[in-house]
Amino acid sequence: MFITHSNNSITDNIRNTKEQINDLSTRAPMVSIADGAPASPKTTENMFNDKTPIDMEEKNDVKYLRLLSQSFPTVAAASTEIINLQAILNLPKGTEHFLADIHGEHEAFRHVLKNASGNIRRKVNDLFGNTLRESEQRELCTLIYYPDEKLELVKASEPDINDWYHITIHYLVAVCRLVSSKYTRSKVRKALPVDFSYIIQELLHETTDDANKAAYVNGIIDTIISTGRADDFIIAICNVIQQLSIDQLHILGDIYDRGQGAHIIMDTLARYHRWDIQWGNHDVLWMGALAGNKACICNVIRLSLRYANLTTLEDGYGINLVPLATFAMETYGDDPCEEFMPKVQDSSRVDQKTQRLIALMHKAIAILQFKEEGLLWQKHPEWHMEDRMLFNNINYEKGTIVIDGVEHPLRSNHFPTVSPQSPYALTPEEQELMDKLHHSFRVSEKLHRHIRLLLQHGCMFNICNNNLLFHASIPLNEDGTLKEVEIMPGKSYKGRNLLYNIGMLIRAAFQDDSEAEERQYATDYFLYLWCGPDSPLFDKSKMATFERYFIEDKATHKEHKGNYFKLRDNESIVDSILDAFGVTGPNRHIINGHVPVHVSNGENPIKANGKLMVIDGGFSSAYHKETGIAGYTLVYHSRGFQLVQHEPFTSAADAIQKGLDIRSTTYIIEMSHRRMLVADTDIGSELKRQIVELQRLLYAFRHGIISENGGR
């Protein structure tokens, strides 16, 4: 899926749906319908008889059908396609998984994908609950999740490996058969690796229950083993099971942040079959850093140093932090920097000497951040961020600062690079450092590749199967009405138009054909998206970074949430937002993340009488104590919604060696009165539209308007 221009525009929806349809059909894709109008609510059974006849005076109408006839040149071909599409409409809808706020926790993220949020474990139990012991089921699941690594352990300990291969392949084929049962053979075939496509298809569609076929099936498996291909086959079919267990992955923002593996998550997604993302505030911060926004660069580095997680910066993207370390030691070497000591959960991971160096670097980049932010606030007075230019409020002789009219003592008054007369001016050494950091981000090829992926698969919001997806907030007035927000001088928007135009502005920062002035403004605007009060990715009164570092009084640390967060429990407010975005249907929802759900304090992630679901459960290990859990997955399958609540994941190594899985608790949120079919989904609407056009083509064939086999 490649989103080139807008956020969920009608044209984009058609383009994306077409690509999804290609997964469902073996035929060549039909020509896209240009007007993008919503599909008619009529059923396919009565579409043909009451349709409007073809208008012979409308040349485009006939021209379109002639173009369509190139793919379906005969009555037989068009009829066959209608039969195929109608059959697809009657399949169960695919399983969607929703995740939010991963924050660089790559091991937990990858494990949740591998075990399909516990669904594979349930499938194994459904199949073998009465025939395999618990320990054997656990071993089989571990093999499915981590086939390469588990095979090495098995081969080192199994006395009769060929016997193990034979039994295990039978088990894996049974699991694969179950998870593939809701899809067409065509779609399953496309998920199969080329080397084993035919073999897996044969094994899926034949069973040993039939005495006539038992020898055939066992013969295939014996040959796989005797030719030395058992390992490769097992790895291949395990990957197929993983892929077919999740039809579509939705990420509601914040892949990036404090965790060590955001780059690993992006590498995983680059290979993933179907996914989309609604950008979060941390994602746009990294986008801004790549675009060249120096304040964003400082924020990205500061957050990594705050949690002593430099792996993504240094190992993932090759960002050179040596100049920062050198500058920090020279400038702050005699500063205790106590308030800048990193937050380290595992003290054995970072020794004291390294923590001390990180603290120096942390302060150096924080001061640079405040300067670069101040310069942008000065450059853009229309953003009304002057109150965040806190260097102006410091009495450098007394070591105090005035916040909201109250004078507070500073924890530290050591600002060797800040001039009281011109506090936001960079020293020559700071400027040289900033230039080097800027260059390092701009030339990171891997970061370019990953941000390109975010742009291709992402947007500010998405509407999918009557669900409105966005990361954080919709700016609201106190009365719950949509708030007008100025994103460019003289250009204000609200609701859907606001998110759409912010998405366009984000893309302008990376498009070579953008005007230089527009591109620079878009690059600057990333900072406002990160921490501006009216940003739909932030929506708080302020980001109290300076206060947390330098002021003891915790009252100054308070960040007051915007009206959306105050009103989102109100069902009528949620309904009005859904109406404004054009989300219809009796079972419509808002799904978002951003603000951790404090389960340990009794907070419920389901709000507004079930119409709003907040799925930030704290994937990041830093939030585990705060939320009491280790993240959520929202699962939307053919029978309804389930919320899967995860407990902390130890490590992939423990999962492989000890068979430890993420312990999860599943809650039924909303169940359908009947099993939902493809016909009930967005893809189904598009398939119905295609059926209508094919029926019009049949009409044209049968009434001599267009000749079969491409004739005129």
Model-found features: residue ranges?
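Short terminal hydrophobic/aromatic SLiMs and anchors at protein ends
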Residues: 8-13, 33
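Cationic, low-complexity basic patches in intrinsically disordered or flexible, solvent-exposed regions
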Residues: 20
